[in-house]
């Protein structure tokens, strides 16, 4: 089960107290326990106004998470000698990152697609300005590459990981590895094309790579081969942190900027 439920919803204008009361009902199809066991929060994305300039609808990014989830993170932080100050769903962390980026750089483009190439899969987050629009999950990740190397070279997955990191015997450029990169690229391209088809007034023309897989240049090369997309590192959206691998900390930096 997901640690946090998120959704974009529209509600009529109401007070903060009314919103606090009504927000749990927006998640009635997702929650598996009593609503008193959850924290609910929201961010206003847009106030829709009528002809007389009065607010007629509120577009919200809303989220819900079990209170025990927050307590688990609080306990983990305490054991490490830290104090939990802020907990954000990843969509909100990326939004905070883009809020800072837009303020600093005043970019021409308003549409962003962050592609987190992770261990178990790929997660794509599409935002317009600093407002989250949608996400897509792809069931291909670095674990698939490790397993492919493991099978081809006849070693266990732990050894295959070291072979991947060192490109032992050309593990990263083997035809099977290259085929996996192109499968990843094809799925990423399909998601971008689907978004562009359904949002013809906007157009995604570039993607920003983050996560552990962002260090694998062949993945970006494969995307460029199969799609008319500019592929950039997520570090281009981030302030200079002095990190040697900023693509690993994209969401963490978003949380820090929000805090």
Listing of model-derived features with the role each one plays in the protein:
Residues 91, 151, 159-205, 213:
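Adenine-nucleotide phosphate-binding core of ATP-dependent small-molecule kinases
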Residues 39, 105-114, 159-163, 245-259:
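A polyampholytic, Gly/Pro-enriched intrinsically disordered region
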Residues 93-96, 214, 232-259:
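Glycine-rich phosphate-binding/hydrolytic loop that grips phosphoryl groups
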Residues 202-229:
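Glycine-rich phosphate-binding loops at beta-strand->alpha-helix junctions
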